[in-house]
Structure formats: structure tokens, C-alpha cells
């Protein structure tokens, strides 16, 4: 008949029978009497526990007819199907972004408020979702359970691993509308777009330099603190960034994965290849304000300024004490002795 005579006094929602209302009340009381014996997670209904239990087994009886992926629950399959249909019926009233599930919309809505009810007990950082907090906790525990089968790098989240995996394929489905460059991840494209817009929202409080990404600022700050936590096990040299250490390691392994398409010369670092390219293009974007001489690399300009215009001679002969502006001149001089 459609009659729902049992009303929840907390939220006003109506139900057809008393038993369903009693189950519903547990949402408001927080009562979760049904505990999973495998992982300890609690649920307010027995049926929800039974569905959850399937994740601890290989039982996935609900296959997707589009892509073949299988699911433990019919409800999860129905939500998954929206990926193929493109259906996003739950729209955020603030920004208009659509979502396939109501719960995802509710979690998203918190970014438009200051509500961050899930604090990290280690560092005090707060999060809008419990799931995000749990992922964040892996930073403190060092847990990286998702391992790339290609290169062995570990990740805290499965989604990060899936995005990373694209670097081992040619799949780059996110093109920049400004310059046409393609990216494996949407997030990387969004960061790249800041190059074209000039947006640099992250500013260093020490020197005022601004950056497009928070991670770039965090790495930059180490210049002021002198912090170099990443040490090479081969030669003991330390670095402020893990990425720089990885690049440095290629010196010891002899790996040179970046090859010049003009002349075939190979390099251990991408930036070395980019600088080398300028030899072929003739590009010299760094000009000396003193004499107007141009250079392909910023570091070469900096060396030029110090040695030519300041008279600095940092390379000293240990035999006779004579100093030189360049290392190669010192090496040539050493042959005299």
C-alpha cells in the first residue's frame, strides 16, 4: 500500500515496519553490535556485516557485463555500472560537480565547509573523511601495501598505484588544452595548468618565492633549514628530496634513460637532456645583466657572474697555490706540475 506508519523521532524518516525503524535508530545512536571477526569493523545491521564479510573471501558473485569486473554486493555492482553509463545523479549544490553515489557527494560537501571531524592523533591534521584519515595514517606508519609490479615502488593507496602504473604504458588520457601536452593523471594535468595561468598559491615565508604546488614549497623550505634527509648509500652524499636522490643514484648504476632525438646522446637525468637540447635549438634564455652574455643554463650564468665580474677564483692548485675561475683551467694547469 506504500504506507509508512513508523516515524524516526530523530530525522523524521518513515518506515513500513517497526523492525526496520529499530535498525535505522542505530545510525543515530552509533550502535554497531555486529562485529566482523576478521578485521573488527562494526556494523549496525547483520545483513551489512554478511555483505562486508565477502571482502575477506574470494566470493564475488556479481559480475559487470561491460568490463567483467566482479563485486561482492549487488549494490556495489549497480554503483559501478554508473561508470559505464556516465550517470552522476548526485549534484553538489555549491560547485555543480556530479557524483555516482550519494555518500561520495556527502563526503565531497565537507570541502565547502570548515568541518573536518577526523583528527590525526600523530600530527593533529584534520580531515573531512575517515577514509582520508586512514590513508594519511600510513605516512606515519610507513605502510605502503600497494607495490608496482614493474618497478617495485610502494604506495599507500591503491588509486595512487593505478595512476602510477600509467607511466609504464603510453596511456596519457588527459591532454592540456593550452599546449597539447598529455598526462597520465588528471591531478598532474591540473598542476600543469598552473604554468599557463601563472597561479602560484604556495609562498615561502623565508624568501617570498612562490610555487604552483605545495610539495614544491615543502621541498624548497629545506634550502633554508639545510635539511638533507635522503642519503646515497653508495657515496654518502645527502639530498633534500627523495626524487633528487633517485636521479643521483643513476650516476652509480650508469643508467641513462633520457636520449636526445637529435644526436643520440643519453643522460641520467631529464633536466640534463632538456639543457642539452638547447645546444641544438640555440636557445640561451639566461642573460648576464653586467655584460649581456647569454647562457643555456642558469647555473652557468651564476658561475659566470661570480668568476668574471666578482673576480672569484674558487679552484686553487695544491702545488703552487695559484687560483683559477674554472675547474677545467685548473686541471690544464696541473699538467705543468
From Swiss-Prot:
SUPFAM superfamilies: beta-beta-alpha zinc fingers
InterPro entries cross-referenced by the UniProt entry: Znf_C2H2_sf, Znf_C2H2_type
Pfam hit, one: zf-C2H2
Keyword Hydrolase on entry: no
Any one annotated GO CC term: nucleus
Family indicated by similarity: Belongs to the krueppel C2H2-type zinc-finger protein family.
Name listed for the protein in its UniProt record: Gastrula zinc finger protein XlCGF26.1
Organism: Xenopus laevis (African clawed frog)
Amino acid at each position: 500500500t506504500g504506507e509508512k506508519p513508523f516515524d524516526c523521532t530523530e530525522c523524521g524518516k518513515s518506515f513500513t515496519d517497526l523492525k526496520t525503524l529499530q535498525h535505522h535508530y542505530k545510525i543515530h545512536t552509533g550502535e554497531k553490535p555486529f562485529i566482523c571477526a576478521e578485521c573488527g569493523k562494526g556494523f549496525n545491521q547483520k545483513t551489512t556485516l554478511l555483505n562486508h564479510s565477502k571482502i575477506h573471501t574470494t566470493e564475488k558473485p556479481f559480475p559487470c557485463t561491460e568490463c567483467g569486473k566482479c563485486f561482492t554486493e549487488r549494490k556495489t555492482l549497480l554503483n559501478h555500472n554508473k561508470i559505464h553509463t556516465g550517470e552522476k545523479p548526485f549534484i553538489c549544490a555549491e560547485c555543480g560537480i556530479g557524483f555516482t553515489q550519494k555518500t561520495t557527494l556527502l563526503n565531497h560537501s565537507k570541502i565547502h565547509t570548515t568541518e573536518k571531524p577526523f583528527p590525526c592523533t600523530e600530527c593533529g591534521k584534520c580531515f573531512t573523511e575517515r577514509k582520508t584519515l586512514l590513508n594519511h595514517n600510513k605516512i606515519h606508519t610507513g605502510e605502503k601495501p600497494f607495490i608496482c609490479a614493474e618497478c617495485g615502488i610502494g604506495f599507500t593507496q591503491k588509486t595512487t598505484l593505478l595512476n602510477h602504473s600509467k607511466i609504464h604504458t603510453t596511456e596519457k588520457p588527459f591532454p592540456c588544452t593550452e599546449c597539447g601536452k598529455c598526462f597520465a593523471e588528471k591531478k598532474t594535468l591540473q598542476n600543469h595548468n598552473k604554468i599557463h595561468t601563472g597561479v602560484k598559491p604556495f609562498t615561502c615565508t623565508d624568501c617570498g618565492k612562490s610555487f604552483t604546488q605545495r610539495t614544491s614549497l615543502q621541498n624548497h623550505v629545506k634550502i633554508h633549514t639545510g635539511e638533507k634527509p635522503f642519503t646515497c648509500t653508495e657515496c654518502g652524499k645527502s639530498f633534500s628530496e627523495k626524487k633528487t636522490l633517485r636521479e643521483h643514484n643513476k650516476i652509480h648504476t650508469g643508467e641513462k634513460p633520457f636520449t636526445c632525438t637529435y644526436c643520440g646522446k643519453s643522460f641520467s637525468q631529464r633536466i640534463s637532456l632538456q639543457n642539452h637540447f638547447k645546444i641544438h635549438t640555440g636557445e640561451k634564455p639566461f642573460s648576464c645583466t653586467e655584460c649581456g652574455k647569454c647562457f643555456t643554463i642558469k647555473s652557468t650564468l651564476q658561475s659566470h657572474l661570480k668568476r668574471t665580474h666578482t673576480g672569484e677564483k674558487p679552484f686553487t692548485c695544491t702545488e703552487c697555490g695559484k687560483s683559477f675561475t674554472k675547474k677545467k683551467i685548473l686541471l690544464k694547469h696541473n699538467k705543468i706540475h
